Amino acid sequence: MSEIRNFEIFFYNDLLICPDCSKNFKLHKQVYNIDGIPLYVLYEYDEFLERLFFQYKEQRDVVLKDVFLCEHLYLKKIFKKYCVCTLCSSDAKRMERGFEPAIDMYSSLDVFVQSPFYKKKDIKQSSATKSKRSQINNVLGLKQLYPLPKKKILLVDDVCTTGSTLLAAKQLIHPDCMFVLAAHPLWILANQENI
């Protein structure tokens, strides 16, 4: 059977993800109302995505930047209508990695991705407690000399774990809508009433 599958893959010149791997992406495709702002969630965050994000971001496997959105190229048409603004890594993390993961991921949709935020302190959110994460508004700042195009604003991020970063950014930039690649199952569960 695997020989047949491999033979079929031979005919897909632009295939970035094999059909077996593609099945591991747990589609969620849900819209949440967060204080009157729509938040679009593409995937449910799970162990597969956790490993993939780690390999991409921390092991600097930059070729993976295209796999997250390659099967959702219909988003290009939608994203082009907006000024796409992403959340940022800390300066230290950006220097260590040598790239800005969210910018590169969303740039795969052929849109220019703005980076109007900065982190006042270097805080690793994945190891922070929920109460520390809720204080992200004290850590996130908006660049003063960073003019944005006169378009509707789409705020994007890679993962929504508790939603604290998105809420802090929302207060600073007042987006028309928000989009994340993946949301943590606990966040999804806690926000069922916001669908």
Show where each model-derived region lies.
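Short cysteine-rich clusters marking metal-coordination/redox-active sites
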Residues: 1-9, 18-21
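Flanking scaffold residues of small Cys/His-coordinated metal-binding clusters
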Residues: 13
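Active-site-facing substrate-recognition patch
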Residues: 17-83, 91-96, 100, 107, ...
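Short, well-ordered alpha-helices that flank and scaffold nucleotide-derived cofactor binding pockets
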Residues: 107-111, 167-174
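Metal-dependent phosphoesterase core characteristic of DEDDh/y 3'-5' exonuclease domains
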Residues: 113-116
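Residue-level marker for buried hydrophobic side chains located in beta-strands
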Residues: 153-155
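Cofactor-binding loop segments of dinucleotide-utilizing enzymes, especially the Rossmann-like FAD-
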Residues: 158, 180-183
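Acidic, divalent-metal-coordinating active-site segment for phosphoryl/phosphodiester hydrolysis
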Residues: 159-169
